[in-house]
Amino acid sequence: MNKIVRTLGLTLFYITHDIASARYVSKKIYVLYRGTVVESGSTDDLIRYSAHPYTIALVLSSIGLSGLASETLGEKIFEATEQDQYPKCKFAPGCPLAVDRCFTEEPEKIDLGVGHYAKCHFAGDIYNYTRKIGIGNGLNMADLKLRVGR
């Protein structure tokens, strides 16, 4: 597929929950949650240094650490919420880092550098933490909560 895309100069939209497979067919990834882009960036940077809790869950699930993703973020991230009941951050009801602000203020798109963006009030702190620790290398949500002022 990559050869065809390169040869013909095409753009490919590959929609999946499997970040691992997306890694092989894309140079840039956009992560959507309930119709909103919550994170985007180069494939390598986004996978290695995720800055949004939902992206972290997807990455942990795709590298065979789905148990850690469930333990880290909880199963509630996949529960349905009525459209008119959404807080300002659509991920807030399932996010272990959510604070009152997440329910009352829509997060801005944060520029993390090198074309990497995330919509989370704590994106900078999360990004710095994942750059230090690395996804799958002992990611500890309790420690991350402390680092973002919880």
Predicted regions and their residues:
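P-loop NTP-binding/switch modules centered on Walker-like glycine-rich loops
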Residues: 1-71
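Unusually extended, aromatic-enriched hydrophobic runs near protein termini
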Residues: 18-23, 32, 139-142, 147-150
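Charged, flexible cofactor/metal-binding loops and thiol motifs
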Residues: 42-149
